[in-house]
Amino acid sequence: RTVIHAVKGAGFAVYEGQSVAIMGSNGSGKSTILAAIAGLLPVTNGQIYAAYEPRLMGVGAALLPKVSGLRNVRIGCLALGMSSEQIDELLDSIIEFADIGEAINRPLRSYSSGMKARLLFAIATSIRPKILMIDEALSVGDKEFRAKSESRIQEMLASAGTLLMVSHNMAEIRRLCNRGIWLEEGVILADGPLDKVIDTYTKGK
């Protein structure tokens, strides 16, 4: 059996109020790092410490395809630890933010990737997370939704929230992040101010 080490000694610390872009080639270990921080993948070596529960939002996040968007909102909120009373209070604002119209009552399997992204983001940020991790999820939304999502992320960062983001969209990264980490084959090649890391990454690709 071949053992593949997706991430190799990639140690770093992220502080409140920081917004970090993790960039690198496909298969470099970016998504693996986010999944490990979220507790979705076991860590075979080293430790992960977080002051708050990290919330991961990705295009492959678990939603139930056979039930309605509305039902998925309730299930997603329960998974985030909300009470039924909290869900009832937030339900209208989540539906309004997702802005998918009557589709909220249709089975999720009928949704486009953009509609799923809208619903996921609305659920994930309904209670402002202190640590939000985004794995390419904003890239599938339309321009209007991305602008609305970025505005909510900026609000979160302004209140000392923390963002870790995987994206190949450099314009999006520049708008949202102030620090960059370049990862290749599970190894950190650069870590520092965003513009400097983007420059190093672009030249080294």
Where are these regions (language model features)?
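ABC ATPase nucleotide-binding domain signature region
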Residues: E16-A21, S25-A79
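Conserved ABC ATPase "signature" region
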Residues: R74, Q86-A103, A122
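Conserved ABC ATPase signature
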Residues: P107-Y111
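A short, proline-enriched helix->beta-strand linker immediately N-terminal to the Walker B motif
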Residues: T125-I134
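Helical segment within the ABC ATPase nucleotide-binding domain
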Residues: R146-S159
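H-loop/switch region of ABC-family ATPase nucleotide-binding domains
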Residues: S167-H168
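H-loop (His-switch) and adjacent beta-strand-loop-beta switch element
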Residues: L176-P193, Y201
